[in-house]
């Protein structure tokens, strides 16, 4: 049992490294204008995370459109705004499919 747990930890570490490599490649391809290739890299990274039953890293999760799956580059194919109407939050709009993602901002309690 201990051997299996050690193997799982090692394989999850390898999977996390592969996800980081794929997301860096997706960022490069999206910067150069090859959006289809970057979508494929994002999809591969998601499949690896699902197969290993591990959560997708938060730093990369916010850079992916949940509707069309494209890699978001702020200012190029995504618009970022801060709003404080009902509650303070960041609004990220994908300019390819016009989907909106809202991320709440934690405020310090008085």
UniProtKB/Swiss-Prot annotation:
The keyword Zinc applies. Keywords: Cytoplasm, Endonuclease, Hydrolase, Metal-binding, Nuclease, tRNA processing, Zinc. Its main location: cytoplasm. It is an enzyme of class 3 (hydrolase). Its cofactor is Zn(2+). The keyword Iron does not apply. It catalyses: Endonucleolytic cleavage of RNA, removing 5'-extranucleotides from tRNA precursor. GO terms for molecular function: ribonuclease P activity; zinc ion binding. Binds 1 zinc ion per subunit. Gene3D superfamilies: 6.20.50.20, Immunoglobulin FC, subunit C. GO terms for cellular component: cytoplasm; ribonuclease P complex. Optimum temperature is 36-38 degrees Celsius in the absence of L7Ae, 48-50 degrees Celsius in presence of L7Ae. It is found in: Cytoplasm. Zn(2+) binds at residues 65, 68, 94, 97. Consists of a catalytic RNA component and at least 5 protein subunits. Belongs to the eukaryotic/archaeal RNase P protein component 4 family. This is Ribonuclease P protein component 4. It comes from Methanococcus maripaludis (strain DSM 14266 / JCM 13030 / NBRC 101832 / S2 / LL). The lineage of its organism: Archaea, Methanobacteriati, Methanobacteriota, Methanomada group, Methanococci. The gene is rnp4.
